[in-house]
Amino acid sequence: MAELRLSLNDQVTPELLRQIQKLQHPGKLMKGISLELLSLTEKAFEKEGDPAKWKSLAASTIKQRNKKGHWPGKMLQVSTAGLAASVQPFSSATEAGISAGSGRSAKYAAIHQFGGQAGRGKKTTIPARPYLPMRQNGSELDLTDGARKSILEMMYDYVQK
């Protein structure tokens, strides 16, 4: 008859238990992930692109902003209470993410992330200017390669420490 014997030494067991406990209570990791997503978003606003530079504003938009004293300036940051300021991290013990826009401004946030028709009668085409670290893949949203890499590194570090 075959016999299987498993023995753990005292040095391995506490470390293994610590790692298992970390995985049972990942709230700290989730908070870190949400803050990393926020940081990546802030970098996209600063660089006005992620990874490719955003398409320039329409000449009519530049003229309108210039008239109001908002040009030159950042494309999606006309006011301090605008789109960039609306991006907020959220986390719990089981999830992490960021949100952009709320209420009426949610449509504004989405049109700039994904592009599409806007304005009265939906006659204006707004090009996608992705600022969140995610891309549309059919009906799904995927993290960008950079965001995925950062999060995987955070997860690895979390378990190793």
Please report, for each region that a protein language model flagged, where it lies by residue.
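Short, Lys/Arg-rich flexible segments
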Residues: 1-161
